[in-house]
């Protein structure tokens, strides 16, 4: 009797993946669950989730302002949702761990959703005279990549491509262009709008929209959020502070130090 061949090893460690998922902070978990819920809702044929919640310039009005917040949660098909979830999870988890759960909620339900949407509507409707609807969490992916690129630029201004030095802050722009070229039905304008807001976030211009820590501590203490909510990240638990440069690299003393060419991004679309 022939001995069955051993199965090839998995490309990932299931135990480590499970451990990582169990350690995800609260807001990140909620975002992932809402994205999954909207994808499941889109499977039925009675009501179109995409038509209801997409960012459609001509549909924005007093009674449909909710679209400014719903479009990042909605996706077109399983592949769109799956790839965006893979790319968004580490970025959003890192942001929440650094800044706290309440700050993440205030920013992502507020300016980090509405500001990219505002830029997109302004250009798409009033300059391009078009009405292309967009959906997808890649708006947050490119926004967070833009913010991280600014932080990286402060400590490592350039990466080397052969003998050419390229500013590290441009890496999301290259990713945006490549995604638009190689991935069909993507929104270059939507991704670019997100990168612009990400740059502003990384430069600290959106600090005014962050609630003061005194107020956040009062809310946390009054509602006992840390004791009541599992995986909640309090103001005093955040890792590196709100706007500090992450200690992933150290700039060379007395000169600029190029970094190797590397990039963490997504190849998924923001669009129908």
UniProtKB/Swiss-Prot annotation:
Q: What is a biological process (GO) this protein takes part in?
A: proteolysis
Record's subcellular location: Membrane
What does it catalyze?
Answer: Cleaves type-1 transmembrane domains using a catalytic dyad composed of serine and histidine that are contributed by different transmembrane domains
Which segments cross the bilayer?
30-50, 72-92, 103-123, 133-153, 164-184, 186-206
Null phenotype? Answer: Impairs growth under hypoxic conditions and leads to increased azole drug susceptibility, reduced siderophore production, and full loss of virulence in a murine model of invasive pulmonary aspergillosis (IPA).
Keywords for the protein's UniProt record, in alphabetical order? Glycoprotein, Hydrolase, Membrane, Protease, Serine protease, Transmembrane, Transmembrane helix
A molecular function (GO) held by this record is: serine-type endopeptidase activity
Q: Tell me the domain of life.
A: Eukaryota
Topological category with respect to the lipid bilayer? Multi-pass membrane protein
Q: Which residues are glycosylated?
A: 185
Q: Does the keyword Acetylation apply?
A: no
The reply on keyword Membrane is yes
Tell me which EC number(s) this protein carries. 3.4.21.105
Q: What class of enzyme is it?
A: hydrolase
Q: Which residues carry out catalysis? A: 138, 191
Pfam families attached to this UniProt entry: Rhomboid (PF01694)
Enumerate the SUPFAM superfamilies for this protein. Rhomboid-like
Q: Which GO terms describe its cellular component?
A: membrane
InterPro entries reported for this sequence: Peptidase_S54_rhomboid_dom, Rhomboid-like_sf
Quote the function comment for this protein.
Rhomboid protease that catalyzes intramembrane proteolysis. Required for transcription factor srbA activation by mediating its release from the membrane and thereby regulating its activity under hypoxic conditions. Essential for iron homeostasis and resistance to azoles such as voriconazole. Required for virulence in murine models of invasive pulmonary aspergillosis (IPA).
Q: What does the similarity note say?
A: Belongs to the peptidase S54 family.
Name of this protein: Rhomboid-type serine protease B
Q: Which organism is it from?
A: Aspergillus fumigatus (strain CBS 144.89 / FGSC A1163 / CEA10)
């Amino acid at each position: 009797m022939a001995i069955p061949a051993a199965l090839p090893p998995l490309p990932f460690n299931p135990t480590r993946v499970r451990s990582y998922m169990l350690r995800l902070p609260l807001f990140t978990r909620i975002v992932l669950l809402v994205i999954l819920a909207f994808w499941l809702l889109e499977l039925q044929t009675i009501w179109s989730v995409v038509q209801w919640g997409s960012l459609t310039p001509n549909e924005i009005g007093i009674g449909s302002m909710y679209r400014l917040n719903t479009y990042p949660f909605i996706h077109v098909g399983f592949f769109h949702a799956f790839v965006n979830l893979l790319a968004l999870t580490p970025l959003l988890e890192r942001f929440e761990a650094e800044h706290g759960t309440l700050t993440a909620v205030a920013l992502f339900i507020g300016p980090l959703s509405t500001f990219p949407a505002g830029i997109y509507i302004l250009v798409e409707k009033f300059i391009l005279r078009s009405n292309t609807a967009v959906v997808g969490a890649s708006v947050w992916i490119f926004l967070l990549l833009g913010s991280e690129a600014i932080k990286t630029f402060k400590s490592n201004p350039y990466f080397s491509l052969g003998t050419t030095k390229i500013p590290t802050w441009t890496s999301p722009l290259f990713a945006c262009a490549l995604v638009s070229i190689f991935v069909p039905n993507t929104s270059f304008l939507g991704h670019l709008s997100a990168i612009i807001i990400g740059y502003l976030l990384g430069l600290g211009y959106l600090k005014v929209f962050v609630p003061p820590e005194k107020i956040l501590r009062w809310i946390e203490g009054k509602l006992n959020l840390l004791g009541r909510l599992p995986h909640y990240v309090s103001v005093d638990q955040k890792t590196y502070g709100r706007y500090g440069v992450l200690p992933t690299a150290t700039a060379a003393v007395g000169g600029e130090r190029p970094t190797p060419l590397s990039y963490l991004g997504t190849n998924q679309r923001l669009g129908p």
